[in-house]
């Protein structure tokens, strides 16, 4: 990260938890997240909110505004705040 600048990155794929087998397409490994060199990594592909932050990198699957598959109308999104005093924070917002 560069002082006085926010580095935000986007990635699309499956986060690889320790218990996962290497059978998913587009794996994102924990060390790749930790080494991303950004303040916030916005992740996509999953339709639910999951925080997979590693090291100093905040990494979050945002959820889906339409709701998870099979649960239409129960959506949520992630609102991210980048504050020079407090760093990266986020909150989930329900979409009705």
Functional labels for PLM-detected ranges:
Residues 1-59, 64-69, 74, 81:
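His/Asp/Glu-rich metal-coordinating catalytic cores
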Residues 69-96:
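C-terminal functional module detector
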């Amino acid at each position: 990260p560069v002082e006085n600048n926010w580095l935000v990155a986007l990635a699309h794929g499956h986060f690889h938890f320790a218990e996962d087998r290497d059978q998913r397409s587009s794996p994102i490994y924990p060390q790749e997240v930790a080494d991303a060199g950004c303040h916030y990594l916005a992740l996509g592909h999953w339709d639910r909110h999951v925080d997979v932050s590693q090291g100093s990198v905040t990494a979050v699957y945002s959820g889906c505004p339409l709701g998870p598959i099979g649960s239409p109308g129960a959506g949520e999104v992630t609102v991210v705040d980048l504050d020079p005093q407090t760093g990266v924070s986020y909150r989930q917002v329900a979409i009705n």
